[in-house]
Amino acid sequence: MGKKHKKHKSDRHFYEEYVEKPLKLVLKVGGSEVTELSTGSSGHDSSLFEDRSDHDKHKDRKRKKRKKGEKQAPGEEKGRKRRRVKEDKKKRDRDRAENEVDRDLQCHVPIRLDLPPEKPLTSSLAKQEEVEQTPLQEALNQLMRQLQRKDPSAFFSFPVTDFIAPGYSMIIKHPMDFSTMKEKIKNNDYQSIEELKDNFKLMCTNAMIYNKPETIYYKAAKKLLHSGMKILSQERIQSLKQSIDFMSDLQKTRKQKERTDACQSGEDSGCWQREREDSGDAETQAFRSPAKDNKRKDKDVLEDKWRSSNSEREHEQIERVVQESGGKLTRRLANSQCEFERRKPDGTTTLGLLHPVDPIVGEPGYCPVRLGMTTGRLQSGVNTLQGFKEDKRNRVTPVLYLNYGPYSSYAPHYDSTFANISKDDSDLIYSTYGEDSDLPNNFSISEFLATCQDYPYVMADSLLDVLTKGGHSRSLQDLDMSSPEDEGQTRALDTAKEAEITQIEPTGRLESSSQDRLTALQAVTTFGAPAEVFDSEEAEVFQRKLDETTRLLRELQEAQNERLSTRPPPNMICLLGPSYREMYLAEQVTNNLKELTQQVTPGDVVSIHGVRKAMGISVPSPIVGNSFVDLTGECEEPKETSTAECGPDAS
């Protein structure tokens, strides 16, 4: 006999756990009739009892299964298949019963209308805005989305403030970012794709100007500029026009605008011609192949047309100005031998800086020195001139002698850790420069030069003469000549001052006290120099203006030195711009110089040669005929005269 299976505690209370409290539904239809439904209906009860009976059968089946497993082991697979089939059948029966219960409940529950949710107003407004956008705005928005995808870090999404980047507003005068560009597109401020392209370039260049090349912002701006220029290239835009509908509409609207503008400006004859040209261009573009050669040819043809039309307009304007001048202007060429050296093919030229001192006309031996001759080129990313720094390899480090004091016989006498020359060379240097006090025959270069007469000084002067082409010796001669004259002048001034003081004392006794004070004050203010006497009031005003301009120039120089001597912050590449005080002083100096130059002739300000050189005008040298001088004839004539004069005396 098999062992009787013990009933589990959970099986005893299965019925109590399975039964749930039925739900009660109260339905009001028409305001009077009330129908009550409860989940404890007959169909539901029957299904409930069926589930219980199925559960009991399932338990009995488990028991039988165990008994069979103990008795029969080989036929397990067939029994499993049968069980699976029976379980599937029971599951289907359960699902059918549950579906029937749900249908009964749906019949008693009143029908409720499901209204669609209200659409938000923002979406409708956004759709209206999208519908109202012009083809140009849609095209620009499409390009902006492509450009912003190339900025995953969102460095250029919002404007940069001085709080984020110190001194940004002082360096970058025209900031730009993606949000500002979007706002411009929304306000319809862009008239073409080229304007968007210019603003995109400005945004990237601003970041590259403010940040150093080693920063991530500089690298991100450079990468964004490279990829953005590919997106905004003509080939990419042409491909977008072929693939997107509103890009093709963009070309039509632009042509219509050009036609209306041309017709409104009064160019009726040219309007019809442009329409024909535009229609022809559209037809050619429709049948044109996308080859690069054809595109280049079409571009060249358009550029030639544009240049020819511009030249015709310029000729018409010149003719109109000549006619309106009333004979003052003519088209004939001037019969002059002057020409412009720096004249460009389009007829324009450049104006150089006017400077009265010229190396050709000015003093002999004068040579202008430019800043580029004294210093090299500025490195990229460096905002200051590099000072002179001696190379470490050129520096000589001798052996260092050590002194430990007494009782140090076995200690090392010298240290050659950092020396780059030998001990013998170090001893030679120490003996020559007089640094070693132990040697009795030590001497220095200064003592050697003092005791060896003037030969080294002559060598140094001759070397300087070779370098300056004789300028050093001339300057020494001028100094020697000016020294006795200066001494004589100082002596004369001292005697004149003493005489004036002696003259002031007796005259002061005779004159009134006010005159004494006035003369004493004049002597103090002028430091003994004679007071300036002007011929007219205009000359006095002119001199005052010059003095004021000199003072303003000094103040401007001090302000500039103060600004340029301050160390810029490390995050700034460019120098700080001029301050408000510098701008104000420069404006005052300019106004004063304008007033002064208006009161004099141009020849007093600058020479004719300087003006011509600044404008790039070259005057041909005069043709020299038989202007050579026979030196032999001139030398023979005085000999004849001398013999003629000496003849009577000799006779």
UniProtKB/Swiss-Prot annotation:
One of its GO terms (cellular component) is nucleoplasm. Residues 58-69 have a biased composition (Basic residues). GO terms for molecular function: histone binding; histone H3K14ac reader activity; p53 binding; transcription cis-regulatory region binding; transcription coactivator activity; transcription corepressor activity. It is found in: Nucleus; Chromosome. Acts both as coactivator and as corepressor. May play a role in chromatin remodeling. Transcriptional corepressor that down-regulates the expression of target genes. Binds to target promoters, leading to increased histone H3 acetylation at 'Lys-9' (H3K9ac). Binds to the ESR1 promoter. Recruits BRCA1 and POU2F1 to the ESR1 promoter. Coactivator for TP53-mediated activation of transcription of a set of target genes. Required for TP53-mediated cell-cycle arrest in response to oncogene activation. Residues 47-57, 70-103, 290-316 have a biased composition (Basic and acidic residues). Residues 536-567 form a coiled coil. Residues 34-103, 252-316 are annotated as: Disordered. This is Bromodomain-containing protein 7. Ubiquitous. GO terms for biological process: chromatin remodeling; negative regulation of DNA-templated transcription; negative regulation of G1/S transition of mitotic cell cycle; positive regulation of cell differentiation; positive regulation of double-strand break repair; positive regulation of myoblast differentiation; positive regulation of T cell differentiation; regulation of G0 to G1 transition. The gene is Brd7. The keyword Plastid does not apply. InterPro entries: Bromodomain, Bromodomain-like_sf, Bromodomain_contain_prot, DUF3512. CDD domains: Bromo_brd7_like. Interacts with IRF2 and HNRPUL1. Interacts (via N-terminus) with TP53. Interacts (via C-terminus) with EP300. Interacts with BRCA1. Interacts (via bromo domain) with histone H3 (via N-terminus) acetylated at 'Lys-14' (H3K14ac). Has low affinity for histone H3 acetylated at 'Lys-9' (H3K9ac). Has the highest affinity for histone H3 that is acetylated both at 'Lys-9' (H3K9ac) and at 'Lys-14' (H3K14ac). Has very low affinity for non-acetylated histone H3. Interacts (via bromo domain) with histone H4 (via N-terminus) acetylated at 'Lys-8' (H3K8ac) (in vitro). The modification Phosphoserine is found at S279, S289, S380, S475, S482, S483, S621. Residues 131-235 form the Bromo domain. A motif (Nuclear localization signal) lies at residues 65-96. There is a cross-link at K21, K127, K186, K197, K201, K212, K241, K305, K344, K389 (Glycyl lysine isopeptide (Lys-Gly) (interchain with G-Cter in SUMO2)). Residues 35-45 have a biased composition (Polar residues). Keywords: Acetylation, Bromodomain, Cell cycle, Chromosome, Coiled coil, Isopeptide bond, Nucleus, Phosphoprotein, Transcription, Transcription regulation, Tumor suppressor, Ubl conjugation, Wnt signaling pathway. It comes from Mus musculus. The modification N6-acetyllysine is found at K328.
